[in-house]
Curated annotation (Swiss-Prot):
Esterase; part of the gene cluster that mediates the biosynthesis of the selective antifungal agent ascochitine, an o-quinone methide that plays a possible protective role against other microbial competitors in nature and is considered to be important for pathogenicity of legume-associated Didymella species. The pathway probably begins with the synthesis of a keto-aldehyde intermediate by the ascochitine non-reducing polyketide synthase pksAC from successive condensations of 4 malonyl-CoA units, presumably with a simple acetyl-CoA starter unit. The active site is at S127 (charge relay system), D216 (charge relay system), H244 (charge relay system). One of its GO terms (cellular component) is nucleus. It is an enzyme of class 3 (hydrolase). Its EC number is 3.1.2.-. Signal peptide: none annotated. This is Esterase. It comes from Didymella fabae.
Length: 270
């Protein structure tokens, strides 16, 4: 079993990271916050002097995601943000938005209780978490509301989307303004259906970094999220020779970390 409890900011005390800007992290479907913290260990280590990472836990119990049991089989319970199997019960848009907001807020508030003062400046997600992260950014762009953040925070300035699939999901809770959540939550599934947002009229302009594994079976859908739903002038792409996982190789992680620093600088309020 891999070691999980080592701090992602090894070499720095907790006190020394409390002032840093924060990145809110959303795990993939069929995993959980503890697993995602382990999966992000190299990235958080390379950014330990720049950002404090906080990890949100999805609201609904799930079966384990693809390839999760082989490494993290004893790390349950596993959670999901959206339906990713036809056997899972459907959830109303209103219920999903409420639970999503509460889960993100809980993670931020728990970190606030540690005495942190840094603003939450970005949202990062992997797989289903990236799909949700992009949708949260779009909802902020459309409504001016930042799910999970309260009045003291000015909103997410950028997003980091690791292997996120098309399409965006509609988080609008206004009856008549939404057909509900996207039904395209299954990895590699082409089903779009009436609940998906139309890429011709919905473009995310908040800056996003997209990280795509060239051996990932879902690569076509990952490219579609970037090309069809994100404005080209606000996107940055990193491709790496990997499958559907968070990069761990030092050189690849260094590229991602460098672009995150760059985005943070470009979107800084100072």
């Amino acid at each position: 079993m891999p070691s999980s409890e080592a701090s992602p900011a090894a070499g720095l005390s907790e006190d020394s990271t409390r002032h840093l800007p924060r990145i809110l992290c959303l795990h993939g479907g069929g995993t959980n916050a503890r697993i995602f913290k382990a999966q992000c260990r190299q990235l958080s280590a390379q950014l330990k002097r720049d950002f404090r990472f906080i990890y949100a836990e999805a609201p609904w119990i799930s079966i384990a995601g693809p390839d999760v049991l082989a490494v993290y089989g004893q790390w349950g319970p596993f959670k999901r943000w959206l339906r990713w199997s036809p056997e899972q019960p459907d959830i109303t848009t209103q219920e999903t938005v409420k639970e999503l907001d509460q889960c993100l807020a809980r993670a931020v508030e728990a970190d606030n209780a540690c005495g942190t003062t840094g603003e939450v400046v970005a949202i990062l997600g992997f797989s289903q978490g990236a799909k949700v992260a992009a949708s949260v950014l779009y909802w902020q762009q459309r409504s001016g509301q930042s799910l999970g953040l309260r009045a003291s925070n000015s909103g997410y300035r950028f997003g980091v989307l690791l292997a996120g699939s098309s399409p965006l999901v509609d988080l609008s809770t206004c009856e008549g303004d939404s057909n509900g959540l996207s039904e395209n939550a299954w990895p590699g599934d082409d089903m779009i259906g009436p609940r998906a947002l139309d890429c011709d009229t919905h473009k995310l302009i908040i800056p996003t970094l997209h990280v795509h594994g060239l051996q990932d079976r879902g690569l076509r859908l990952h490219r579609a999220l970037m090309e069809d739903f994100c404005a080209p002038e606000s996107t940055t792409l990193i491709e790496w020779d990997g499958v559907h996982r968070v990069p761990l190789n030092r050189a690849e992680v260094s590229r991602v970390a460098g672009q995150i620093r760059k985005l943070a600088g470009l979107t800084s309020n100072s």
